[in-house]
Amino acid sequence: MKMILLLRKTKNISSFNFINNFKKTKGFKKIGHCGTLDPLATGLLIVATDEDTKLIDYLDQKDKTYVARAKLGFETTTYDSEGEIINQSSNVKFTKEKLIEVLNSFIGLTKQMPPKYSAKKLNGIRAYDLARQNIDFELNEVEINITKIKLLSYNEDENYFDFEVVVSRGTYIRSLIYDIGIKLNSLAYMESLERTKIGNLFLEKNQDDKILNAKEIIQLEIIQLEKNQIENLSKGLLIDLKNEDNFYALFWKDEMIGFGQILNNVLKSKKLIGKKIQKILGDKQSE
């Protein structure tokens, strides 16, 4: 049964194990997700099931909103509370104005170094596997965009602060908090993290999951196709279609069937979901 859902991941479980538990509970044959959350983190995951898993690579394009807690005065191996403390700073007292000033300095396009304990790959090997073996290596910086950052609270007695941040795909909040600590001439690690929104998608407080329509989450222009056009595309044929040169999501009514590209007013399929097309064309033959 194909489906795209928004799920709320719980704490202390990997994203992979969380969605596989969901798959077994609901009886899906296949499941996939985008936008991995660390075991420590909670919050939203976009999940696709059965034949809709073929859409996964195209679902994780939106900015994400997080609420995080940063603990001041310490650095850990993993940049979060699950790591071993390796450095300490006594410079942990700041005014709210200073915190806001430093947070605001991160708004905009910037470069970020991913944490070594991450799923980034180096020569095909996960960075966290290399880090656990104490192998020395360097990751490449990535470009990120922070569109909003807001101080929510500051506990001066316990030396932590909470903030909300809206970031582009691929941003590591652990690394952001580490960088904030450095810019404060201190140290900091991530104590907790919740992903509260993906684009404009969110769950109400009493919701743990919600079924999504593909049109809500695909950040591409949409082309609505007729059955005869779908049949031609399934045969590898090109379709004359006047439109701007671009990459498009292909739909039959409310059903997303794949992706295509228009060049010089000619549409060529790039990825099609065979089972959906078989059903659509089967319905055509029965008409």
Curated annotation (Swiss-Prot):
Q: What GO MF annotations does this protein's record show?
A: RNA binding; tRNA pseudouridine(55) synthase activity
| Domain of life, per lineage | Bacteria
Q: What is its EC number?
A: 5.4.99.25
Question: Mind listing the UniProt keywords for this protein, alphabetically?
Answer: Isomerase, tRNA processing
Return the similarity comment. Answer: Belongs to the pseudouridine synthase TruB family. Type 1 subfamily.
Concerning HAMAP family, the annotation shows: TruB_bact (MF_01080)
Q: What is this protein called?
A: tRNA pseudouridine synthase B
Originating species: Mycoplasma mobile (strain ATCC 43663 / 163K / NCTC 11711) (Mesomycoplasma mobile)
